[in-house]
Design a protein with these regions (language model features):
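Sec-dependent N-terminal signal peptides
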Residues: 4-13
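Periodic aromatic/glycine/histidine/acidic cluster detector
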Residues: 17-77, 81-89, 93-101, 105-113, ...
Length: 138
């Protein structure tokens, strides 16, 4: 009995420490369905954004700092599979970026720094064969 009480107390303590975000509908489709939601911290700063297809399936989601993308962002195909993953810092693409085709094969992969291509980039055809490679200056 003591173990259950201790476990329950720990769950409530953890839940109380978890930051609560306020969710607001930012945009809607003409039919009234949600197109974009934003999540705000206690200070009123937008910290996450989620965009939806008209079906309600998540189209894109990621972190925000105010009005700029910040952190990991993922885009999804209408069936829910991941289409792309990338990172933003202060609204600019930074770090590794990977994009897949609807058949699951890679489309492109490479790196960004402050919004521009850097380093080695690769592009693939629909069958996953390497089409081209480009080396961008750091």
């Amino acid at each position: 009995m003591k173990n259950w009480f201790l476990l329950l107390a720990m769950v409530f303590a953890f839940a109380a420490c978890t930051p609560r975000l306020e969710e607001k509908v930012a945009e809607t489709y003409p039919d009234g369905k949600t197109q974009k939601t934003q999540f705000f911290d206690k200070k009123g700063t937008c910290v996450k954004e989620v965009e939806y297809y008209e079906t309600g399936q998540v189209k894109m989601e990621g972190g925000m700092k105010g009005d700029k993308r910040d952190g990991e962002w993922k885009a999804y195909f209408p069936d829910g599979r991941v289409q792309s993953i990338g990172t933003f810092v202060n609204g600019l693409r930074t770090g590794k970026a990977t994009v897949w085709q609807s058949n699951g094969n890679l489309l492109q992969e490479g790196y960004y720094k402050e919004g521009r291509h850097i380093g080695h980039w690769k592009w693939y055809d629909e069958q996953g064969n390497l089409l081209r490679e480009v080396d961008y200056p750091e």
